[in-house]
Amino acid sequence: VELGSKVTGFNIDDEVWGCTSNANSGTHSEFVCIDVDEVTHKPNNINHLEAASLPYVALTTWSALIRWSGLRPNDLKGKKVFIQGGAGGVGCFSIQLFKNLGCEIATTCSKKNIELVQSLGANQVIDYNEDNFEDVLHNFDIAYDLLGDHVSHNSIDKCCKILSQSPDSHYITLTHPLVNTLDSKGLIM
């Protein structure tokens, strides 16, 4: 294991965590060469198993918000955010991140997970077995759809229905349109 000649703030024996960029795979390897901005010191209060899983959910959300949607943390304070599927790994992290950035959070989950998402900071929770979120929620600034149409029928339309009519509203999804095309039409070879 080596440090690059211009790397500062790290020592060879430091415990670190991070994630390579999409262009640089190899994280299933025993060793990988990684840019210094893709790694940081592992917090002392978590173990290596937790350190291996947290960056994935954190960077999934951060990448969707910052890199792909163009939102900036300072612009989110006071925004109304809907998270479709708040009880999963990415959803649980997203609730905490948006809450920490000063947002009002609404989310969906099953009845058994309501207390969990509330404890993470959700202001409003809709049990998806009891209510349709698109009938309850209105004028949201951001709809973060973690399920997409391949899991929840017409999810895109339902999420867009709850958005305010502002040009600053955002629909963010983790589902690439290609997934739905492959599901409906198959793989073209």
What are the residue ranges of the model-derived segments?
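Terminal helix/beta-alpha structural elements that buttress the NAD(P)+-binding lobe
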Residues: E2-L3, T8-M189
